[in-house]
């Protein structure tokens, strides 16, 4: 069924809104993936706060024009699935990477973060970004280890001073 001009404008506006509020985007080719598996992916995406849409290439090019994701324009060939992460930059990359492991026909083309194009081979850089809570926990552990280490060194210096006396 052909889309009318108003339908196309609505799709471009919807994808553009998602792009403006997104932290990162991932582009993939979903040819050969069953409807049941795609439905499962969409459900997992909703739970992870990821916006997923299969869009015509000309429409998605217009939608991302003027956003941080314009660098992805060259990857819009063939059937295009685009996923935007709005809560955490690595959410879409992590979700699609895990899905690609289970579905051999699903292929990640590229990703974008802060206006930088990330090739499919380097998608791990984005997928392995810690969440805010994980980063905060790592920072607190670093502070805790630093203060504990300083305390141990102080005790060792005190012991050495008493032994020398």
From Swiss-Prot:
Signal peptide: none
Transmembrane segments: none
Alphabetical list of InterPro entries matching this protein: Ribosomal_uL10 (IPR001790), Ribosomal_uL10-like_sf (IPR043141), Ribosomal_uL10_bac (IPR022973), Ribosomal_uL10_bac_type (IPR047865), Ribosomal_uL10_CS_bac (IPR002363)
MF term (GO), any: structural constituent of ribosome
Gene Ontology CC terms, in alphabetical order: large ribosomal subunit
Gene3D superfamilies: 3.30.70.1730, 6.10.250.2350
Cited function: Forms part of the ribosomal stalk, playing a central role in the interaction of the ribosome with GTP-bound translation factors.
Protein family according to the UniProt entry: Belongs to the universal ribosomal protein uL10 family.
Protein name: Large ribosomal subunit protein uL10
Biological source species: Shewanella pealeana (strain ATCC 700345 / ANG-SQ1)
